[in-house]
């Protein structure tokens, strides 16, 4: 190869190298410009957000405060309303209980009078005047018992029933083959309940 050819080859290589270097520089400049642009955009966005935060309308702030106050008052109202409803239910329940048993003392005081009327009805007589009087007493007794039953009074069942210490009072033991052991063979005095509460237990004779 001649000196001329070598010179041409070197010039060509230099030109290619310069071109590559220039291209790299251009690429770097372009990337730098893009990065700068992104940074500027981000800075503008941050500045814009700060301005939005700083420039809250006083009216909007007042509305937010009023809304918060309204929410707090609503919560207080709901809590008070729930407490009031619970109070009403409790009072209503107490009133129902009092109403159910308000006649208990009066009925208890009436029971001895009923016993006396029933004893009088057991007396026998042939006189027409006596029979007429007894019939009148019987009508009064029936009316009284029906009125008391309408108010919750209930006669406790006895004869033939199994003895229950909760509603029966055993006075005498019996030995009757017609009844099972523990069954009531005879009622000595009537017992009464007011709904589910015993006013007076029945006095009974219980089979052994």
UniProtKB/Swiss-Prot annotation:
Stretches with biased composition (Polar residues): 13-23
Subcellular location per the Swiss-Prot or TrEMBL entry: Cytoplasm
Annotated Basic and acidic residues bias: 1-12
Top-level division of the source organism's lineage: Bacteria
Keywords for the protein's UniProt record, in alphabetical order: Chaperone, Cytoplasm, Stress response
Region (Disordered): 1-59
Oxidoreductase among keywords: no
Listed Acidic residues bias regions: 42-55
GO CC aspect terms: cytoplasm
Presence of keyword Chaperone: yes
PROSITE patterns noted in UniProt: GRPE
GO BP annotation list: protein folding
Molecular-function GO terms, alphabetical: adenyl-nucleotide exchange factor activity; protein homodimerization activity; protein-folding chaperone binding; unfolded protein binding
HAMAP family, per the entry: GrpE (MF_01151)
Subunit description: Homodimer.
Function: Participates actively in the response to hyperosmotic and heat shock by preventing the aggregation of stress-denatured proteins, in association with DnaK and GrpE. It is the nucleotide exchange factor for DnaK and may function as a thermosensor. Unfolded proteins bind initially to DnaJ; upon interaction with the DnaJ-bound protein, DnaK hydrolyzes its bound ATP, resulting in the formation of a stable complex. GrpE releases ADP from DnaK; ATP binding to DnaK triggers the release of the substrate protein, thus completing the reaction cycle.
Similarity section: Belongs to the GrpE family.
Stated name of the protein: Protein GrpE
Organism of derivation: Staphylococcus aureus (strain JH9)
Gene (UniProt): grpE
């Amino acid at each position: 190869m001649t000196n001329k050819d070598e010179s041409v080859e070197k010039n060509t290589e230099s030109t290619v190298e310069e071109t590559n270097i220039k291209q790299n520089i251009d690429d770097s400049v372009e990337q730098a410009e893009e990065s700068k642009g992104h940074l500027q955009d981000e800075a503008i966005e941050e500045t814009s957000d700060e301005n939005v935060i700083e420039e809250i309308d006083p009216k909007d702030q007042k509305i937010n405060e009023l809304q918060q106050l309204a929410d707090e008052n609503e919560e207080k109202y709901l809590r008070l309303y729930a407490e009031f409803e619970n109070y009403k239910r409790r009072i209503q329940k107490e009133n129902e209980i009092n109403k159910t048993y308000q006649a208990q003392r009066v009925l208890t005081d009436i029971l001895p009078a009923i016993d006396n009327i029933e004893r009088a009805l057991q007396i026998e007589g042939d006189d027409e005047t006596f029979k007429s009087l007894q019939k009148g007493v019987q009508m009064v007794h029936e009316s009284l018992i029906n009125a008391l039953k309408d108010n919750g009074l209930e006669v406790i069942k006895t004869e033939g029933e199994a003895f229950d210490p909760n509603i029966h009072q055993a006075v005498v033991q019996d030995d009757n083959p017609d009844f099972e052991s523990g069954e009531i063979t005879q009622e000595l005095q009537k017992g009464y309940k007011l709904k589910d509460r015993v006013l007076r237990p029945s006095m009974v004779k219980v089979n052994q």
